[in-house]
């Protein structure tokens, strides 16, 4: 009888070696079985995996192992999203080349992932910084360019004068570069763009087909695409107030019904009217410059104080030339949305109301609730943006907002200003073309050449890849490619004269927008093998963080359409199923206050309970430290747990089991030492129960019981098998864990009976059948333990290669039913009884219940109402 504790340090490497030696997880494209493609968002090689990685990749691995067992040909690959800023920062700070830093990190993280026992097809591995990968990306760029999906234009950018690079809007914090802290400048640069807006309507409409995506993600993408139907209205300007030659300003609005509530117009700092006004007024010029520096990210616009400056320009109301409104430059109006000009209706929009109150502008209610009194309805601190009827709107009074929209649109479409209609209906999208130019070294080179005679010339495909020169220096800010003495100088492919390479590299989001396609045939000379891509795609289950809900997923959807347009794939949508997992979070620990606060790692802390109160003690000094909030694990607050430490102490299976067990997978899981220890105790319990009975289990063939002593354990095993199948299908891993705990509890006594030699052959055979089911159930989550237990009970081959067991329908039929029992209509008890019990048996059993006896107090009920298979009501 085996009684040794399970030793993951011995077992886990052994099984990992066996899987690898047998190429168990390598996938063949010509396998005739139904395909299943499961993919977790590939990692950036930062150097170490964290517990978030462990949770993400464990979830994907459970799906892969389960689907493999269910008979699918599973593709479960891994690669590295390897270009990007951190490698260049490391080069500047540590004097190490980005390539060296990146590939060293890949080697470290790959070793860590292998220790987790993931069933990955490593034969398809690549990094996006491999020339073999970005050669095919350059090929795609040239195909998109030929198809008209890529173009260049002058674009306003956020320029960091210290780092000498373009910053995304999100990287501008209160007007300063997120890294350098320098005041950001606005510059006009020629940038490369992908025409994602060509697909705006399709990207929006197709969201309705993605029924295996979270509704939250679909809504986020819908809002980001931002389709709106409105009216472009031309407002005549009072010529006496205009500093330049402009005679009118066009405003796009989705609420023309509120025109009579307008009290101001607001324009972007980059609007031609603003530039004209700024040229003649230093105060306006300074304000416009402040707006440009502040950043134009959604977060910046929504959180910044709403400010404006009166330009002195006056616009005439479209329905009343005697009514003039002031034109402000405002920091919340963007030049690249609509026309860069809006009208403000303070009564119907909170932002406009705040602005109007600040600058003492009129607030006229124009929509009120249907049951309100127009004589008394007013606007206080909050704008009214609900449905209702029009008031204070002349010929619109009494109409609904929808009717007023149509009335205004119809009138203005038929009203002429300077010989053309004053308004036209427009559909606008918030989505903008994707600017991919980055003034960085560590990215995919853009494969074009600039010739003074021929203009922009694509690099011939035969000359791809355009590789990054290795001999660059990072001793000064800016793009090393601009400074390279030879790399940028090249002969023009068309005329042969001296020319220059493009020194911008591609946004790293490009690299991750098609990698899932490359995994289908990473050895192919072209970007894809269309046959393989069309076979494997779409990805059946994609798993990753909610933070990628918009950009990465939207860009990938665009890329798939662009690749279809250029003949590389035959589908539109890359991901059939999407799952966004929660984070791994942990308590924070600290000592000191304010600027003196010092964060302390969990490894330095011992948590004690004194008089029912938890307290944290610094192990080395013995001093009590503050227990803070539970937050996402982060290096800055040091509330991180190193997966290597956990796996080293408890084994990979314990870590895997814990991150799946505590919370629904789409919610955060709180890391706790007690939780990990609990998972480890369960691992040891399963091992002990099975190995103590293993010798006798090996001596019999597995056979479920149809009656007798073994029936209960067979029913428990087969019912659990059916339920866990459904849980795995729905990615409800925490529910599967709970059921497996229950099954082990149900099996404990029979296993002990077998181990002690007190079970007959029929019971032993039933227990072996249940044990085989249990091992198969835990195999996706705890694959090493499953292999070890399978070997112990005499199983043949690898669990990783075994088909999923089938439940016996006869054993999952519930022979009993639980009925709620009411007394005078209020539930007082539950009755468990045979499903086929007749009315008389049910009544007798009900009368024997303690709650019913107490209510009757020795008497008889007036009547007992039995609703078959549903409920019992006792009337007393």
Swiss-Prot record:
Its EC number is 6.1.1.4. One of its GO terms (biological process) is leucyl-tRNA aminoacylation. GO terms for cellular component: cytosol. Coiled coil: none annotated. A motif ('KMSKS' region) lies at residues 632-636. GO terms for molecular function: aminoacyl-tRNA deacylase activity; ATP binding; leucine-tRNA ligase activity. CDD domains: Anticodon_Ia_Leu_BEm (cd07958), LeuRS_core (cd00812). Signal peptide: none annotated. Its main location: cytoplasm. InterPro entries: aa-tRNA-synth_I_CS, aa-tRNA-synth_Ia, Leu-tRNA-ligase, Leu_tRNA-synth_edit, M/V/L/I-tRNA-synth_anticd-bd, Methionyl/Leucyl_tRNA_Synth, Rossmann-like_a/b/a_fold, tRNAsynth_Ia_anticodon-bd. Keywords: Aminoacyl-tRNA synthetase, ATP-binding, Cytoplasm, Ligase, Nucleotide-binding, Protein biosynthesis. A motif ('HIGH' region) lies at residues 43-53. It catalyses: tRNA(Leu) + L-leucine + ATP = L-leucyl-tRNA(Leu) + AMP + diphosphate. The keyword Protein biosynthesis applies. It holds the Pfam family tRNA-synt_1. It is found in: Cytoplasm. ATP binds at residue 635. It is an enzyme of class 6 (ligase). The keyword Lyase does not apply. Belongs to the class-I aminoacyl-tRNA synthetase family. This is Leucine--tRNA ligase.
């Amino acid at each position: 009888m085996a009684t040794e504790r399970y030793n993951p340090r011995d077992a886990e490497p052994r099984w990992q070696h066996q899987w690898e030696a047998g190429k168990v997880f390598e996938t063949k494209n010509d396998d005739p079985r139904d395909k299943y493609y499961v993919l977790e968002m590939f990692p950036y090689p930062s150097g170490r995996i964290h517990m978030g990685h462990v949770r993400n990749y464990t979830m994907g691995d459970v799906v892969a192992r389960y689907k493999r067992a269910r008979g699918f040909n599973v593709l479960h690959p891994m690669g590295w999203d390897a270009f990007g800023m951190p490698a260049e920062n490391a080069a500047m700070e540590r004097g190490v080349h980005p390539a060296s830093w990146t590939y060293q990190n890949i080697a470290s993280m790959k070793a860590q992932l292998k220790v987790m026992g993931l069933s990955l097809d490593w034969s398809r591995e690549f990094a996006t910084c491999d020339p073999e990968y970005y050669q095919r990306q350059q090929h795609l760029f040239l195909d998109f360019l030929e198809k008209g999906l890529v173009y260049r234009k002058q674009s306003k950018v956020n320029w960091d004068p210290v780092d000498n690079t373009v910053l995304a809007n999100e990287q501008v914090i209160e007007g300063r570069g997120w890294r350098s802290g320098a005041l950001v400048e606005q510059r006009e640069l020629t940038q490369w763009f992908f025409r994602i807006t060509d697909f705006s309507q399709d990207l929006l409409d197709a969201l309705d087909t993605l029924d295996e995506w979270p509704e939250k993600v679909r809504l986020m993408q819908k809002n980001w695409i931002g389709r709106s139907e409105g009216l472009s209205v031309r407002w005549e300007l009072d010529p006496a107030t205009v500093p330049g030659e402009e005679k009118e300003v066009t405003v796009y609005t989705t609420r023309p019904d509120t025109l009579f509530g307008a009290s101001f117009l607001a324009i972007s700092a980059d609007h031609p009217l603003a530039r004209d006004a700024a040229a003649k007024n230093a105060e306006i010029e300074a304000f416009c410059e402040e707006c440009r520096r502040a950043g134009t990210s959604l977060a910046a616009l929504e959180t910044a104080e709403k400010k404006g400056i009166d330009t002195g320009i006056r616009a005439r109301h479209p329905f009343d030339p005697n009514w003039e409104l002031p034109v402000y430059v405002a920091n919340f109006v963007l030049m690249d949305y609509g026309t860069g000009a809006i009208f403000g209706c303070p009564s119907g929009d909170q932002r406009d109301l705040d602005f109007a109150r600040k600058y003492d502008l009129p607030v006229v209610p124009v929509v009120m609730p249907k049951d309100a009194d127009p004589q008394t309805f007013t606007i206080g601190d909050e704008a009214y943006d609900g449905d209702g009827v029009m008031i204070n709107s002349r010929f619109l009074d009494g109409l609904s907002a929808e009717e007023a929209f149509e009335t205004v649109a119809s009138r203005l479409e038929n009203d002429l200003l300077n010989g053309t209609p004053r308004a036209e209906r427009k559909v606008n999208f918030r989505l903008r073309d994707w600017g991919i130019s980055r003034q960085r070294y560590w990215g995919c080179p853009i494969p074009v050449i600039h010739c003074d005679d021929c203009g922009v010339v694509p690099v011939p495909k035969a000359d791809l890849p355009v590789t990054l020169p290795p001999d660059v220096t990072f001793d000064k800010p800016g793009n090393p490619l601009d400074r390279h003495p030879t790399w940028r100088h090249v002969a023009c492919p068309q005329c042969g004269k001296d020319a220059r390479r493009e020194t911008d590299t591609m946004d790293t989001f490009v690299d991750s927008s098609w990698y899932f396609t490359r995994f289908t045939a990473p050895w192919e000379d072209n970007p894809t093998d269309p046959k393989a891509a069309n076979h494997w795609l779409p990805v059946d289950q994609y798993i990753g963080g909610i933070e990628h809900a918009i950009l990465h997923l939207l860009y990938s959807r665009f890329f798939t359409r662009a690749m279809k347009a250029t003949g590389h794939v035959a589908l539109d949508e890359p991901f059939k199923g999407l799952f966004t997992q929660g984070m791994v979070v942990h308590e924070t620990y600290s000592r000191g206050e304010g600027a003196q606060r010092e964060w302390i790692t969990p490894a330095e802390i011992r948590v004690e309970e004194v008089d029912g109160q938890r307290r944290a003690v610094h192990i080395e000094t013995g001093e009590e430290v503050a227990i803070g909030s539970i937050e996402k694990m982060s290096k800055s607050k040091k509330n991180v747990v190193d997966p290597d430490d956990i796996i080293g102490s408890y084994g990979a299976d314990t870590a895997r089991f814990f991150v799946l067990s505590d919370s629904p997978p789409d919610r955060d899981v709180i890391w706790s030492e007690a939780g990990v220890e609990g998972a480890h105790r369960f691992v040891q319990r399963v091992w002990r129960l099975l190995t103590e009975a293993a010798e006798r289990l090996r001596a019999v063939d597995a056979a479920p019981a149809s009656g007798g002593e073994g029936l209960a354990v067979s029913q428990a095993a087969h019912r659990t098998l059916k339920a866990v199948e459904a849980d795995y299908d729905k990615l409800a891993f925490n529910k599967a864990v709970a059921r497996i705990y229950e099954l082990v509890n149900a099996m404990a006594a029979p296993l002990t009976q077998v181990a002690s030699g007190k079970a007959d052959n029929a019971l032993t055979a039933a227990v072996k059948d249940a044990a085989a089911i249990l091992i198969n159930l835990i195999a996706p989550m705890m694959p090493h333990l499953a292999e070890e237990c399978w070997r112990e009970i005499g199983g043949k081959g690898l669990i990783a290669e075994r088909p999923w067991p089938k439940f016996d329908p006869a054993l999952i039929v519930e022979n009993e039913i639980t009925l709620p029992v009411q007394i005078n209509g209020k539930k007082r008890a539950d009755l468990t009884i045979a499903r086929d019990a007749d009315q008389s048996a049910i009544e007798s059993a009900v009368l024997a219940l303690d709650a019913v006896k107490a209510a009757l107090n020795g008497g008889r009920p007036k009547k007992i109402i039995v609703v078959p298979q549903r409920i019992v009501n006792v009337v007393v």
